[in-house]
Amino acid sequence: MLKQENGRIIYHYDAEELWIESWGKNAVRIRATKNAEMPKDNWALLSAEEVETQIEITEDGATLRNGKVKVSISNGGKITIYNQKGKLLLEEYWRNRRDLRDSKCSAIEVEAREFRPNVGGDYHLTMRLQSLDKNEKIYGMGQYQQPYLNLKGADLELAHRNSQASVPFAISSMGYGLLWNNPGVGRVVFGNNIISYESYATKVLDYWFVVEDTPAKIEETYAKATGTVPMMPEYGLGFWQCKLRYQTQEELLEIAREYKRRNLPLDVIVVDFFHWPKQGDWKFDADYWPNPDEMIRELEAMNVKLMVSIWPTVDRESENYEEMLEKGYLIRTERGFRTGLNFEGATIHYDATNPNARKFLWEKVKTNYYDKGIKIFWLDEAEPEYSAYDFDNYRYFRGTDLEIGNIYPVEYARTFYEGMQAEGQKNIVNLLRCAWAGSQRYGALVWSGDIASSFESMRNQLAAGLNMGLAGIPWWTTDIGGFHGGDPNDPAFRELFVRWFQWGTFCPVMRLHGDREPRQPQYGTTGGAHCCSGAANEVWSYGEDVYKICVKYMNIREKMRGYTRKLMEEAHIKGTPIMRTLFYEFPEDKECWEIEDEYMYGDKYLIAPILEAGVNERRIYLPVGVQWKECNCGRIYYGGQYITLTVSLDSMPVFERI
């Protein structure tokens, strides 16, 4: 049965009800359920703006038109989507005999919208789409630790892990974007025959589909539908210093003083984890941080902001555990002991999906940090990280982990964003280790997690950062040098560090962090002092030659402050990525769709990172239609060609578009 009601097409067959409706200009939202009522959650989507929509119902089916997008559904329930030129962009993969007039009718009985019942009332949902073009390229989808920018052929887990962030918005070279608007754990396969999305426990199929002429327009329309980042504050434009971990107040202050003695630019310095007595206390340990107010005043006098690490984990011995347990503010386990992460104590995470738990945490943070003058937070463990990722074992206020777990980093960011906003703060940014669709509107700056210190890892981060931008997360960064290991006295690591530092200069936020070797002696025996501290990780820790290169690139970053501010304005207003694939800026240049190891920092600078050890040459493609100035020497090149540059350790190829 097909009908028009409340500005949408409604299709009903057996237990399934399906809605097709406009959701912004040139975009539609499609939902289906086998429950008695359609779930009302919007998840990543903001409320829809009203747009002109034409709906037509005929003997053969129904059609909805909205600007550049046309959606058709047959009487048999099959959906197809076209652009304004009549090009087929999406076709559901039905293989049955419900409609014998369908050219693809078949006896193999495969459903495009398969709701397989789970015990307890949810469904294991599979949506199948026909792969229409063997040359299609697909981008976005968040952050995965792999070198592939083009995801066609990829098999991706729709779940968060430390260094993996599922942000399920895909951009296609065919001229569309698709948001899988379901925060449940699942899987997507961008196959050459079938594109399939799965949710392992859900009540509804829900996706949003946009048609536009360029990747930039797709991204901007998506940003209107899901929100944009705030304006980046001034301290987000420069250099951030961090390591695992400064153990005392005096140690951290002495590092900041040394930066100032050397006349080096420094915007933010970081107090890392285990500055607290117990996980879940959310306060400074007075044995090692005796006067945070005085520390913050001294840093402010140096024009340096202090960022403090917050973990969502709560130790059984924390002063807040019993109250949070009694009030239902902790994530639950379906079986076994209530432990999610076994690291420096058996801990469980606060339940960010519970509004009262969000309020409780913020009040603790406000009293112990914010009211002292700390206005930027490092929200670690945001996936949340589990010692065992048994997604079927955790239950939140809003549902099971399998059903809604990917929403956690959004609600974690929201906890702080709304708390800070209520205090009158504007231009809010907080650093998180994970994101889902919509995280950007809560001031989430995502970093790529606990990654290896290797050239292979660095290559993976380049792909991850570009795909995160295309997935709608323009604020993104990495640990310069990688996280795990790396000895500042090792020549091989120094080379990696230099190459990563050069690249980090042209990332949205330039942030130095890592767990360097060898580990340092433990300072103290109580509270957070039980946690380790890595070797020195300041720019002068790597020898004089490396130091000179670091200073050069820190000053380059400073000189670009005005330009970077402009890019942040574009991200705030339109949702534009800071790091952009070549095809984002040059969609008509076919070669740009093939390049995966270069990118644009905004619209002006082409960046060609050095991604291997021992490199003395770099092959670079310069997009067609403009001229390019090599920033190191001023030489001018015509676009539309490959060039080979000789490279030395003290410089990375950068070209200015002229």
Regions found by a protein language model. Give the residues of each.
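Short, glycine-/Ser/Thr-/acidic-enriched flexible segments
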Residues: 35, 174-176, 183-185, 214, ...
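N-terminal accessory segment at the very beginning of proteins
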Residues: 1-226, 230-236, 242-244, 249-257, ...
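Carbohydrate-binding surfaces of carbohydrate-active enzymes
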Residues: 4-21, 263, 298-303, 417-426, ...
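Aromatic- and carboxylate-enriched substrate-binding clefts and catalytic-loop regions
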Residues: 35, 92-93, 265-547, 585-586
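Short, well-ordered loop/turn elements at secondary-structure boundaries
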Residues: 14, 58-59, 65-67, 75, ...
